Amino acid sequence: MFQISNLLIAADFSAEVANNSAVGMIGSFIAAALLIVVPATAFLIFVSQKDSLDRTSTGRR
């Protein structure tokens, strides 16, 4: 751990750069959730509900 902290100090990273990187990472997570996870979840719920309705309607025949 000591070597990593020395490397960061020696590389002269600023707090602003670290902050911008963290904000970008969080923004990427949010974008991924909005673009991939939410539509996939909605689609799977839709298919699951439709399949459930199909099974109950065929069971009544």
Swiss-Prot record:
An annotated GO cellular component: photosystem II
Location in or out of the cell: Cellular thylakoid membrane
Keywords in alphabetical order: Membrane, Photosynthesis, Photosystem II, Thylakoid, Transmembrane, Transmembrane helix
GO biological process per UniProt: photosynthesis
Name of one Pfam family that matches: PsbX
Major subcellular site: membrane
Record-linked HAMAP family: PSII_PsbX_2 (MF_01388)
Assembly: PSII consists of a core antenna complex that captures photons, and an electron transfer chain that converts photonic excitation into a charge separation. PSII forms dimeric complexes.
Full protein name: Photosystem II reaction center X protein
Organism this protein belongs to: Prochlorococcus marinus (strain AS9601)
